[in-house]
């Protein structure tokens, strides 16, 4: 299963920090790629620097048409999840999503849509699932973290990358970092 995150509405200059955090959280919790509808070299460079130091093959990409990308993704039997505070409760829909993902011979790829500003109506219509992580305003970073943790059932929290140049050794008393 491949998990991609599509960031809609990134506002260049205004959303650099939060979009970087969405990307890094996506990577840390198991996603394979983040897609933007416009390029932001600051975000791209930050993501690539983290991957270089901390390992893995997480990708940053830009799509010309987000609608076309979603259509193509769905055509290839992928599942599209839109994170929105107006969607179905994650506690009630997650089991159904996991079952759908495992349906058939191969597990299905997943595309998660996450907005920065008001998300166009078409995103709601194109999504297979409109999912809420609570019905109160909060950070999209929190929403993507919770969804990915539920999707991977906690297995991505302590994932190790063999090509990492930096590795944290958990400790209850002090910082322990291994530089390779």
From Swiss-Prot:
GO BP terms, alphabetized: tRNA nucleoside ribose methylation
Keywords per UniProt: Cytoplasm, Methyltransferase, S-adenosyl-L-methionine, Transferase, tRNA processing
Gene3D superfamilies, A to Z: 3.40.1280.10
Top-tier EC class: transferase
EC numbers for this chain: 2.1.1.206
Cellular component, GO, one term: cytoplasm
Matching InterPro entries: Alpha/beta_knot_MTases (IPR029028), tRNA_m1G_MTases_N (IPR029026), tRNA_mtfrase_aTrm56 (IPR002845)
Compartments, as annotated in UniProt: Cytoplasm
Family stated for the protein in its record: Belongs to the aTrm56 family.
Name the record gives this protein: tRNA (cytidine(56)-2'-O)-methyltransferase
Catalytic activity field: cytidine(56) in tRNA + S-adenosyl-L-methionine = 2'-O-methylcytidine(56) in tRNA + S-adenosyl-L-homocysteine + H(+)
Record organism: Methanococcus aeolicus (strain ATCC BAA-1280 / DSM 17508 / OCM 812 / Nankai-3)
Record's keyword annotation contains S-adenosyl-L-methionine: yes
Binding locations of S-adenosyl-L-methionine: 83, 115-119, 133-140
Pfam families named in the record: Trm56
Keyword S-adenosyl-L-methionine: yes
Quaternary assembly: Homodimer.
Function: Specifically catalyzes the AdoMet-dependent 2'-O-ribose methylation of cytidine at position 56 in tRNAs.
Gene Ontology MF term list: tRNA (cytidine(56)-2'-O)-methyltransferase activity
CDD domains: aTrm56-like
């Amino acid at each position: 299963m491949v998990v991609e995150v599509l960031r809609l509405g990134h506002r260049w200059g205004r959303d650099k920090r939060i979009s970087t955090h969405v990307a890094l959280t996506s990577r840390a919790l198991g996603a394979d790629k983040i897609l933007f509808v416009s390029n932001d070299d600051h975000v791209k460079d930050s993501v690539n620097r983290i991957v270089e130091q901390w390992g893995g093959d997480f990708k940053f990409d830009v799509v010309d048409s987000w609608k076309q990308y979603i259509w193509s993704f769905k055509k290839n039997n992928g599942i599209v999840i839109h994170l929105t505070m107006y969607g179905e409760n994650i506690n009630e829909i997650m089991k159904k999503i996991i079952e759908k993902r495992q349906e058939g011979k191969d597990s299905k790829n997943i595309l998660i849509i996450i907005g920065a500003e008001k998300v166009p109506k078409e995103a709601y219509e194109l999504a297979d699932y409109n999912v809420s992580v609570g019905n109160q305003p909060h950070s999209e970073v929190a929403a993507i973290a919770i969804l990915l943790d539920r999707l991977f059932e906690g297995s991505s929290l302590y994932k190790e990358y063999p090509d990492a140049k930096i590795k944290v050794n958990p400790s209850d008393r002090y910082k322990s970092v291994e530089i390779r």
